[in-house]
Amino acid sequence: MKKILVINGPNLNLLGIREKDIYGSTNYNKLLEIISKKANELNLNTLFFQSNHEGEIIDRIHKALDENIDGIIINPGAYTHYSYAIHDAIKAVNIPTIEVHISNIYAREEFRKRSVIAPACVGQISGFGIKSYIIALYALKEILG
């Protein structure tokens, strides 16, 4: 069974509470439950990590090497737009990574329309609500074989 690490960045722990018109009403724990259920159906094992701190996210990406993680799904939150350190960590571990976003970042404020993370990833999925994570699971399943 392939191991998929799902990393969620700043403020994603507040899903279902913050800006429901943008991020929906599903809370964070329910999101993890939905992802786990679909991953099991796809014969994928998921591990979850959430942090509001850039360094902790980088450390978790590095730790993925020791755990023989096969793929990463990352929603870097606001770090999407300026964290070259997370970009570099993804490049360093060389694990297929998909960047996801609940909202369509290209239909939002100007500063949100640029990702410095996406160029380090095999792909980016944006704008499908929490289904963005499910689409990413299908994509990684295909990529990993």
From Swiss-Prot:
PROSITE patterns: DEHYDROQUINASE_II. It comes from the Bacteria. The record marks 18 as: Transition state stabilizer. Substrate binds at residues 75, 81, 88, 102-103, 112. Its EC number is 4.2.1.10. It catalyses: 3-dehydroquinate = 3-dehydroshikimate + H2O. Pfam families: DHquinase_II (PF01220). Signal peptide: none annotated. CDD domains: DHQase_II. Pathway: Metabolic intermediate biosynthesis; chorismate biosynthesis; chorismate from D-erythrose 4-phosphate and phosphoenolpyruvate: step 3/7. Keywords: Amino-acid biosynthesis, Aromatic amino acid biosynthesis, Lyase. One of its GO terms (molecular function) is 3-dehydroquinate dehydratase activity. The active site is at residues 23, 101. One of its GO terms (biological process) is aromatic amino acid family biosynthetic process. It is an enzyme of class 4 (lyase). Homododecamer. Catalyzes a trans-dehydration via an enolate intermediate. HAMAP family: AroQ. Belongs to the type-II 3-dehydroquinase family. This is 3-dehydroquinate dehydratase. It comes from Caldicellulosiruptor saccharolyticus (strain ATCC 43494 / DSM 8903 / Tp8T 6331).
